[in-house]
Amino acid sequence: MVLPNKFYDQLCNELIEFAKDFDDYGKLDSDETYKDFSCAIEIDESHTAYVELGVTVLAEWQDDSFSHEFGVWDDGYKGYYPSGISVDSIDCLEVQDEYCEDVPFEYDIERIENIELTLNW
């Protein structure tokens, strides 16, 4: 089995959502934060890929201290906010069938290792 293009597209979508979720938890501590990422991607009705990656969440400093909602200045809005994500390492990648049996597969390692995505807010 060769992993289809939709696998790589879905992986990019999952990585973007992962990076965006950091905004829900507040500011980041620096402009680069290393994290572990994992997800399951359905390839077809009977095959699922399980992915574990080491990623770097990229952030940029924002000084949007003016609260437009309340019309006041608030230092709570200063800080590093996610701006992108890049893949550092492939820790685990496996494909299983509907019986949870491992399935041999081929994939483009460079296509995963070279992922660098920018968030568009």
Predicted features by range, described:
Residues 1-6, 94-121:
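Mixed-charge, Lys/Arg-enriched low-complexity segments
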Residues 28-109:
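Acidic, low-complexity, intrinsically disordered interaction modules
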Residues 1-46, 109-112:
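Low-complexity, Ser/Thr/Pro-rich intrinsically disordered segments found in N-terminal tails, propeptides
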Residues 3, 11, 15, 28, ...:
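Generic detector of leucine side chains in alpha-helical contexts
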